[in-house]
Structure formats: C-alpha cells, structure tokens
Amino acid sequence: LRGYGISSSQTEDYQFMHVEDLVTLMDSLHIKKAHIVGLSLGGFITADMLAYFPDRMLSAFLASGNIRKSKGPSEPMTKEEAKVRDEEIAALKKKGVEVMKKEWFEGLMKSGGSQRERMRAPLWQMIDEWDAWQPLHKEVWVVAGLDDIEELKKSHPAVPSLIVEGHSSDNKFSKKTPILEYLPNGKLKIIEDCGHMMNMERPE
C-alpha cells in the first residue's frame, strides 16, 4: 500500500484511494479479475473494491474490517476537522510515537484468544518498523468509507463474499454487518477464540 512498507510515500495534499492503486497494479500486471483478500485496513479496501470495481473481482474475503465508518472522498476534510487533526497530531507528538505504538500493540494483543502469544514477536516487529506517517499527518480519505454504501445500494454486486470476524472476550465487533444487506452472495463467518489479527493467531 502507498505509505506503508517499501511503497512510495503519501502526501497530505494529493487525494487518492488505496483501491485505485490496487486496480492500477492489477492493470500493470494484466490481471483482469482476482480473488481479493484483505484484513483490517485491507478489509476496508476490499469493501471499496466491491463498491467501485466488482467487475474486477472473482471473490472477496474481508477479515476484521469491511465498510469503514468514516467519511469518504465525497466529503473532503473541513477547516474545523483539519483544526481538530492538528490538535490530535500535536498531542501525539507530545505523548510520543513510541508510547502510541506500544498502546496499539498491547490493544491488539489483548484482543486475541488463547493463541495470542504466537503473534507477539512478528506483530511487534511490524508495528516497530512502521514510520507512523499516517497519525502524524492530515491524511486524505484513502478509503471510501461510508461512500461505499451509496455505491453498493445501486449495484448489489453478486461477487461471492465472506465476512470474517474473530470472537474473543476483548475483541468487539457487530454481528449485524450492514454490508451484507447489499451482497446477495455474502456470508458472515465467526472464528471463535480469536481476535483482530486472526491471520497471525489462527492461520490454519
């Protein structure tokens, strides 16, 4: 993804969406259709694919995330929202990025089930190596968020779709999944004794 790993960086003043980058990548590799699998932010992007590019999908697998409950590009950031973000960024800098990373890490660990310890080392490595650009800047709306709903209402894509959530005492999610209202071939699967990072806890 742009802004993560060794991909090119994001900027505050260029509007793009991750889903557009994904389709551009598919085009460059001459991939007409693909099985799209996403976890967390990847789940948000997979929901965007269902809303905007269902014709490029063979199936969808959305884990620990589907429609993000936030504004999309149809509603650009207002001056008031920008001011709030500036205050949040200043507060984070005062608090310290390392403190924020540790809190995030501990929250993800706590969300897990009985197999959570198997993810401790690799999860911390990923978080530790992340440059934290996103929380330190006014990021553009890189996922469609609630804009997805309007698109899905129009198309009701027939793409076979599986929504997957992990169930543990400290992993909260809604069993009423609004996106399924617009996916005639969509299903919800709950994985017991598992948290947000299900791919690391229970890869089998």
Question: Which residues make up each language-model segment?
Answer:
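Conserved serine/cysteine hydrolase catalytic core
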Residues: E129-E181, K187-I190
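Active-site loop/oxyanion-hole signature of alpha/beta-hydrolase fold enzymes
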Residues: L1-V37, E204
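Active-site loop signature of alpha/beta-hydrolase-fold enzymes
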Residues: Y4-S7, R68, N171, M197
